[in-house]
UniProtKB/Swiss-Prot annotation:
Gene name of this polypeptide: CRRSP38
Residue stretches making up the Gnk2-homologous domain: 34-136, 142-248
Protein's name according to its UniProt entry: Cysteine-rich repeat secretory protein 38
PANTHER family: CYSTEINE-RICH REPEAT SECRETORY PROTEIN 38, CYSTEINE-RICH REPEAT SECRETORY PROTEIN 38-RELATED
Primary residence: secreted
């Protein structure tokens, strides 16, 4: 079922919040839906047919080859000042074919939307792709982050908010255990006669302890993001969570 969602993006150093109202279907049957993108001007730009562009294309070729089999890869190409660092991550429950399909869409889209930027990121429901001229591996990305939520309100926001935070906190612990190499977890929680479904995930360049800090940070943004909303997400360049009142992901 199509539902009205709202995206709230917080760019670094922004004075005003940019709010975009969109109609979109973010259901289990549309895993490859485009979510958002950002092209960074901070790191400057490159020219067509330059060494930086060549290194960027090589990076994307490597990610396209490496990621589908494992769901994640991070790589660097070239030497300073034309080196490019990048990663790609597929949702933890995505099949290899779904992962590949998402990357085949996301990478050309990112190149088209950020044609000459030395840094950029794109999010789809099933994957994210990110590149930069600076080495960001192992660090929490505080710059790239946005909210997405259902505009419908729940009948008992106080209880719902508390149970949502409890579920996401529980999933964070599950995702950051020593044996969870995917840094990914899903689960469900009963709220009266209804069920709440949740997902958390980090990019795998982070250590478990850093992943936990990233997830705890965005879970702390629940009141600003999704207070009393039937569904919501905080999506960043290093970690994300999502919750819904319908089963958007397998939990077993």
């Amino acid at each position: 079922m199509s539902s009205l969602k709202r995206i709230v993006w917080f760019p670094i150093l922004a004075i005003a919040i940019q709010i975009l109202s969109i109609h979109t279907v973010l259901s289990q049957s549309q895993n490859n839906a485009f979510l958002f993108h950002k092209c960074s001007d901070i790191e400057g730009s490159f020219t067509s047919k330059s060494l930086y562009e060549s290194n960027l294309n090589n990076l994307f070729s490597q990610l396209s080859y490496k990621v589908p089999s494992t769901g994640f890869a991070a790589s660097s190409t070239g030497n300073t000042p034309n080196n490019v660092n990048g990663l790609a991550l597929c949702r933890g429950d995505a099949s290899s074919s779904d992962c590949r399909s998402c990357l085949e869409t996301a990478i050309p889209e990112l190149r088209q939307r950020c044609p000459n930027n030395k840094a950029g990121i794109v999010w789809y429901d099933n994957c994210l792709v990110k590149y930069s001229s600076t080495n960001f591996f192992g660090k929490i990305d505080f710059e790239n982050r946005f909210y997405l939520y259902n505009v419908k309100n729940v009948s008992d926001p106080s209880t719902f908010n508390s149970q949502t935070k409890a579920l996401l906190t529980e999933l964070t612990k599950k995702a950051t255990t020593r044996d969870n190499q995917k840094l990914f977890a899903t689960g469900e929680k009963n709220i009266g006669k209804n069920k709440l479904y949740g997902l958390v995930q980090c990019t795998r360049d982070l250590k478990s302890i850093t992943c936990k800090a990233c997830l705890n940070g965005i879970i702390g943004e629940l009141p600003n993001c999704c207070d009393g909303k039937e569904g919501g997400r905080v999506v960043g360049g290093s970690c994300n969570f999502r919750y819904e009142i319908y089963p958007f992901v397998k939990t077993a």
